[in-house]
Amino acid sequence: MLTSQYLLSTSKDIPYDAKIISHQLMIRSGMIRKTSSGLYVWLPTGMRVLKKIKNIITTEMEKINALEILMPIIQPEYLWKESRRLNLYGEELLRFLDRRKNQFILGPTNEEVVTNFIGSEIHSYKQLPLTVYQIQTKFRDEIRPRFGIIRTREFTMKDAYSFHINQSCLENTYNKFYDSYINIFKKMNLNFCAVKADSGSMGGNISHEFQAFSQNGEDEIVFSNDKLYSSNMNMAESIETIDFFKKKYSSCLIKNKTNTKKSIIMSEKLNTPLINQIQTFLIQTKINDITSIAALLIRGDHELNFFKVEKIDIINKPLVFLNEKEVISLIGVKKEFLGPLGLKVPIIADISTFNMKNFTIGSNINKHFFINVNWNIDLPMPIFKDIRKVTKNDLSPNGSGYLNIKQSIEIGHIFQLGQKYSRKIQQSVKIKNGNLKNLYMGCYGIGITRIAAAVIEQHHDKNGIIWPDSIAPFEVVILPINMKKDNKIKIIAHFLYKKFKKTGIDVILDDRDERPGVMFNEVDLIGIPHQIIISKRSINYDNVEYRERKNKENILINIKDIKNFIIQKLKK
C-alpha cells in the first residue's frame, strides 16, 4: 500500500466525549469516526485491524472443527417469545414492525434463531456433536453508550453454538472453546484472565468470562494472591461466606456478655467508624405477585452487590430502590437516618453484620442515630444473605490467600446452556432407542470490535498505539526522507517495498512529500510495529535504519539484509 493512495485520516484533535485512551487513539489514528451515540464508521486502518482479529479467530475455530455460517441480523419476534427472553432483555432489544405489521427485532444475540434452524437440520444423534459460528454485526439499544467502542449500540461479534446429545459431550466442546480462547487472546498479546461468571439472561449453569485487564474497564475481577481463586465481582465470595453457610447460623444466636453490652443510646452525632455502622436501604419486593417493600442492611464500609441482591427470590428485577421522597412518605425520615428498628418489612442483612456488636444504626428520626445496638437484644435477628461486594484483602474462599481486585474489559464469554433453548423452542433428535431427546447446547462469544480497544488500552505510550505484529494495520512502514529530492532514495524505497510485498509482508510506503517529523509522528500514532527509515546519510553506506515501535531501538542494517531481518522479527 502507498500512503498517497490510502485514507490515512490521522488527527491531532481529541473529541470532548473521548474520555479514555483507547477511544482517543482510535479517533486520532484514523480507525473510527462517530456518526451518532454508540454508532461508528470503521475507516480503512480500523478495518485492517478488525480483519486480522477475525483471521486469528477463524483459524482457531477451524482447528476445533467449527463450521462458519451467517444468520440474519433481523429476527422474528415470536422466537424470543418462545424462549421467554423478550421481556427479560427489556429495552435493549430494538423492536420494529415491517410494512405487513410483522414484529421483528435487531438481533443482540442468536440463540433463538440458531436453535430453531439447527432443529430443522439435525434429526439423529449420529449428526452430533455439531458446532457452528458466525462473525456478524449485533445491536443492543444501550441506554448510555460510552468509552468509544467498548460500550456501543452496534458491534461485531464472533458467536458460536454447539449442539450435543448429552452433558458430557457438551462439556468436552466447552473445554475445547476454553482452550481456543486462551490461544486467541495470547496471539493478540493481551494480558487477560478467565474467571467464573454468571450466565445472566443467556441461561445455563456454568459460564466463564475472559477479561482483559484495563484501568478503564467497566468490569471488576477478583483473584487471590495464591492464584487459586478467580471470579468476576458479581459472583465473588470470601471465606466469610463459605464459613457462614457451612454453619447453621439460626442456632448460633449472639450472646452478649454483660461486660460487653452497652446501653443503647440515641445520638445526634455520628462519630463511630464506618466498620461499626450498619446502613439501611429500602427496596421493592414481590411476594405472591404483590409488590411490597424489604430492607437491606450492610456494614457501613461495604457496598451492595446488586447481582447478589437480585438473586434473592422476593426481590424485584431489575432492582428498584426507594428514593428520598418515597422513604419520607413511607417512614417519615430522610434516607440517611433510616434504620431497621421498628420496620414492619422483611429485613435482609449481609452476613458480615452477623457478628457485629454495639453497632450504630439510623433511628428513623431525623438527625438522630442509635448507638450500641445488638442483635437479639435490641433488634430481632434478620435474614442473613451474602449481598455485599468483596473488598481487597478479604480472605479468599479457600482461606489460603487474600483477594485482590482489578478493573477489566470483558472480551469473551462462554456458556453451558444445557437444554434451556431446545426445550422452549421444542427442538429434539432421535436417539438410539428411537425416542426423542432435547439437544444440549453451548454458546461462545468474542467481542471483536471490543478486542481492538482492549489491546490499545494495554499497548500504547504518549505517542500513540503500539500494536502487536499479529493485528497491526501494517507490519512494516517504509519512511523515505526527502524522497522527492533524491532519486536514489526513491529507487531504494520502491525496491524494498516490492521485495516485501513479494514476500507476503504487510507493508506501507509513505510516498508523500512530507516533513520527517510529520511522517514519524503519524506512524507512531498509528502504531506500525516495524519502521524502516531511508535517508541520504544511511544509503551512502548501503544501509537503512530500522526502528522498532515498542522500544524505539534504532539499528543500521545493510540494504541486502533488511528483508531477512524483518522476516526474523515477524517470526518472534
From Swiss-Prot:
Q: What class of enzyme is it?
A: ligase
GO function terms (MF aspect): aminoacyl-tRNA deacylase activity; ATP binding; proline-tRNA ligase activity
GO biological process, any: prolyl-tRNA aminoacylation
Q: Which UniProt keywords apply?
A: Aminoacyl-tRNA synthetase, ATP-binding, Cytoplasm, Ligase, Nucleotide-binding, Protein biosynthesis
Q: Does the keyword Protein biosynthesis apply?
A: yes
Classify the source by domain of life. Answer: Bacteria
Annotated domain remarks:
Consists of three domains: the N-terminal catalytic domain, the editing domain and the C-terminal anticodon-binding domain.
Q: What does this protein do?
A: Catalyzes the attachment of proline to tRNA(Pro) in a two-step reaction: proline is first activated by ATP to form Pro-AMP and then transferred to the acceptor end of tRNA(Pro). As ProRS can inadvertently accommodate and process non-cognate amino acids such as alanine and cysteine, to avoid such errors it has two additional distinct editing activities against alanine. One activity is designated as 'pretransfer' editing and involves the tRNA(Pro)-independent hydrolysis of activated Ala-AMP.
Q: What is this protein called?
A: Proline--tRNA ligase
This protein's encoding gene: proS
